[in-house]
Amino acid sequence: MIVVYTSPGCASCRKVKNWLKENNLKFLEKNIFQIQLNQSEIKHLLMRSENGTDDIISKRSKIIQENNIDVEEMSITELVDFIQHNPSVLKRPIVLNEKTFLVGYDEEEIGAFIPADRREKVITRL
């Protein structure tokens, strides 16, 4: 199952959701401001990201800038707690399934969410 972490008013989030719908891919949307992410979800996001916090945390977010926060100095427990209470620091959208992890909307990379058997059919038709 594809999970999409979104926020209201996010243009890239809308692009991802529209692309998934156009390609008839089922997904579960989680608005990070409507539901509080649990600790295991946050740890899972951190584990799945290739570059740790750099991939999923916006260092330019208001709370990080105004408070001069260095997430690299935090323990995992502190980081998870920080994200849980400040979801606005997460880059959006975050899209993942069992095999693929994507932050943001990238027209080429998002194709990885199409199952291999369907990708082969598309390529064969070309």
Regions found by a protein language model. Name each.
Residues 34-126:
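Thiol/selenol-based redox catalytic cores and closely related redox-interacting motifs
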Residues 1-23, 27-32:
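Local sequence-structure signature of Cys/Sec-based thiol-disulfide redox active-site neighborhoods
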